[in-house]
């Protein structure tokens, strides 16, 4: 896994969802279909490091009149009356997120939801909202496949942080939860130094699991996105652990890139 792809996650995320759909479609029974769905996620206030992980968007300004009732909360001297201001607010930003859905053609029943997490899923209220949606999907009988290839942010995949061994949680997390066995979490190791796993994608009871090769998806996104021009001399955020920095230097030196970080 190339951790520098995180700096270009908007483009990479779009590619991963599309390629995942394409990889899964030939494995579907005739009465199931695979679709990419767009939805709007919240962007919240973040500290400097977290802000780097989020996409920049144009500001949208909304104006409103300030009512006299709202002004009563402010003490005004009898000798001086302030001019009434024009109040300008900036709403919470939103970003378009995507996920892969497997549906039963008969009645459009949702069978499995596959999510490649984005920075916008992993902070503050957006994280709380994401976890709420997870619970709703499971209660509705939907299988969950959650793939977190983002370094930094809160624990967003379904099982509690403490339930996942460190070998399967750092720095990336891949978890499958079957709706009929929601107390069980199928966890796959996913690190910087190893090949990303081939994971089982559950369908309906009685259907054979599909297989999703995550490394093939990332390789294709890297190739098709033309990311050979990444500036490896500039370390991404969040910073790497010292032992990872040394390993990355060695790998890039083998490819003729002499200096990074």
Task: Give the label of every model feature segment.
Residues 1-261:
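Gly/Pro/Ser/Thr-rich low-complexity, intrinsically disordered segments predominantly at protein N-termini
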């Amino acid at each position: 896994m190339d951790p520098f792809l995180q700096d270009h996650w908007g483009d990479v995320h779009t590619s991963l969802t599309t390629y995942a759909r394409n990889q899964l479609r030939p494995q579907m029974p005739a009465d199931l279909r695979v679709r990419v769905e767009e939805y709007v996620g919240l962007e919240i206030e973040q500290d400097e490091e977290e802000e780097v992980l989020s996409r920049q968007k144009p500001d949208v300004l909304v104006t409103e009149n300030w009512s006299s009732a709202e002004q009563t909360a402010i003490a005004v001297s009898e000798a001086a009356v302030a001019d009434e201001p024009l109040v300008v607010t900036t709403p919470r930003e939103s970003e378009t997120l995507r996920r892969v859905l497997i549906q039963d053609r008969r009645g459009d029943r949702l069978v499995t939801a596959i999510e490649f997490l984005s920075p916008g899923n992993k902070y503050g209220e957006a994280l709380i909202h994401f976890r709420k949606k997870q619970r709703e999907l499971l209660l509705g009988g939907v299988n969950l496949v959650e793939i977190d290839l983002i370094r930094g942010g809160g624990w967003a995949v379904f099982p509690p942080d403490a339930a996942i061994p460190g070998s399967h949680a750092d720095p990336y997390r891949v978890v499958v939860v079957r709706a009929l066995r929601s107390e069980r979490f199928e966890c796959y190791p996913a690190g910087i130094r190893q090949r990303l796993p081939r994971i089982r994608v559950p369908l309906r009871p009685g259907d054979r699991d599909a297989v999703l090769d995550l490394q093939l998806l990332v390789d294709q996104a890297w190739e098709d996105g033309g990311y050979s021009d990444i500036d490896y001399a500039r370390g991404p955020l969040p910073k790497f652990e010292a032992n990872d920095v040394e390993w990355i230097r060695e790998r890039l030196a083998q490819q003729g890139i002499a200096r990074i970080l």
